[in-house]
Amino acid sequence: MQSRRFMQVDVFTPTPTQGNGLAVVLDGDGLSDQQMQDFATWTNLAETTFIQSPTSPDADYRLRIFSLSGEMLFAGHPTLGSCAAWLAAGGAPKRFGCVVQECGVGLVEIDQTGPMPAFTAPATAVDALDPEQVERICAALALSRDRITRTARLNNGPTWQVIELQRAADVLAVKPFTTRGPEFRGVALLGQGGEADVEVRNLGPASSMSEDPITGSLNAALACWKYETGGWTGPKVIAQGTCIGRTGRVYADCREGTVWIGGQSHILIDGTVTL
């Protein structure tokens, strides 16, 4: 056991305490997978990260990401929040204005030169969502099929079962699942309009919560899908967490064929943890 630098960060919100909380252990070298999982479970946050020495010469650090139930290849708010913590702890990127994170999906760049930090969205695989699964989701959510405009199955590390509705108001009107099961993992809704350009909800998070406050990896997958299919053009402001009292804001843009996902982070706890 040793004392390690620790921070807790609120991510993807302009207002501290209104985003998605993240635990970050900055001195993560030497911990076993089980030790990291045990600590992540103990924090009871959606994700806990461990910053370690990189194995790639091009990376500034390696990031291990754990949910309450297991390790994740990639996640969005851990990417931005861990980067903010690393920089606040004195980290200096090898390339000016760009932090390079090594994680389960490879190297992810986090640009520091814009109005807010933004990461390059990982490649997203797009497949059809099985019609029978759409019916199961609609039945579980009491969702009328005539509200649906498109569906898709997206994968950028996590897998997302996406249902696009006509309007943001339709998204906000849906009640969360009353029953939980693996068939409803990663169910996401989106609709145009509302307080931002797009309203998003993650009703099947990997954590024990009924709804995730703000999900960077989901919004990255949605942005890749929508920009690549021509559904979105220009910068977009995405709201998430509205129904559970959060002010989540994700900023998406596509520049020269690369999708960027940005957001603000606030360090609310800075200290040490004994692990």
Regions found by a protein language model. Name each.
Residues M1-F74, L80-L275:
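Active-site proximal loop and beta-alpha junction motif in alpha/beta enzyme cores
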